Swiss-Prot record:
Organism this protein belongs to: Bordetella avium (strain 197N)
CDD domains noted in UniProt: ASKHA_NBD_ANMK
UniProt keyword Protein biosynthesis present: no
InterPro entries per record: Anhydro_N_Ac-Mur_kinase, ATPase_NBD
Function: Catalyzes the specific phosphorylation of 1,6-anhydro-N-acetylmuramic acid (anhMurNAc) with the simultaneous cleavage of the 1,6-anhydro ring, generating MurNAc-6-P. Is required for the utilization of anhMurNAc either imported from the medium or derived from its own cell wall murein, and thus plays a role in cell wall recycling.
Recorded superkingdom: Bacteria
Catalytic activity: 1,6-anhydro-N-acetyl-beta-muramate + ATP + H2O = N-acetyl-D-muramate 6-phosphate + ADP + H(+)
Disulfide-bonded cysteines: none
Record protein name field: Anhydro-N-acetylmuramic acid kinase
Gene Ontology molecular function, alphabetical: ATP binding; kinase activity; phosphotransferase activity, alcohol group as acceptor
Amino acid sequence: MTQPINGPDNPGRCFIGLMSGTSMDGVDGVLLRLDGAPHLLASVSLDIPPSLRATLLALNSSGPDELHRAALAANELARLYAQACAQLRQAAPEARVRAIGAHGQTVRHRPDLGYTVQLNAPALLAELSGIDVVADFRSRDVAAGGQGAPLVPPFHDAMFGGRGAPRAVLNLGGIGNVTLLAPGQAPRGFDTGPANVLLDAWCHAHTGKHYDHNGNWAATGSVSKALLHHLLNSEPWFDLPAPKSTGRDLFGLGWLHKHLDSSGLRLSPQDVQATLVELTAQTVARAIASEPIQDLLVCGGGARNPAIMQALARALPCPVAPTDSEGVPGQWVEAMAFAWLAQAFIDRLPAGLPGVTGARGPRVLGALYPAA
């Protein structure tokens, strides 16, 4: 459903941002005016069709005829992106859109091997939309020795920085990532570990639902301290120093089943779900334990899950609140970031920061696919 956002009539300099995250639950799109403080003009969320979602999930693992299936899936995703763009422009017809920032769908992320793969067909999207498209945001950073992720900390700094006290912004999509903001310092950021990627997969495997609405299913279970301890202490990734990133390549159902088997525990599915909620909170708490932050703002799908928000509030010594509390709807923050990243590319401003990704230096991120 497209949502026009009331605001000033001046159409300004506008960009569209499109994001389909690790959870693969849908495509989020925003139309953002960026001639000053970012101003949200319209937003849209489109479900990913079940057949496309199944294909994208399958492409996260090796299989037959991958290149052919990946190309077809990328084209289908681009058509869905084009639908989102059309709805956004219809909601704010006065806006003059300079470019689209289209992230694509991550199916492999291996910066340790020098590559990251986001399925996308930006040339097709440019053709269908008639608008210049900026895409392939991660590869340039990986080529410079960086993690290629997370990409949102510079945008978090633009939106939530400058408050005079250290704070953090946590994005809880499929994978959690945190941005550390301190007065007079460049933002730092890194992935914290699994969030919705495991919660959604486990819920779907045992209930048939794509996600645990409001954490209601998890609330019927109890946290297993033994399983939580096993997960936190048997996975080497959690102890890696920042900068670091991860994805479904590591934290999928196979990872969870492996650790459930090695733990020797026999738990109900609800208890496992409750423990995964606690795992999300504890990995965040461990990751920022040494940081003198005064508050934590949360965005992404996890911010709409009361079970996760309550677990974070218990695990952290500082106030925890959704970004909505500062007038920025948490559902749209990541899509807004890719509109902002598209502007940064058009203006040739480096958005890949060494303090976030570990790259050899700042880099301009993205590649341009002109509409004509």
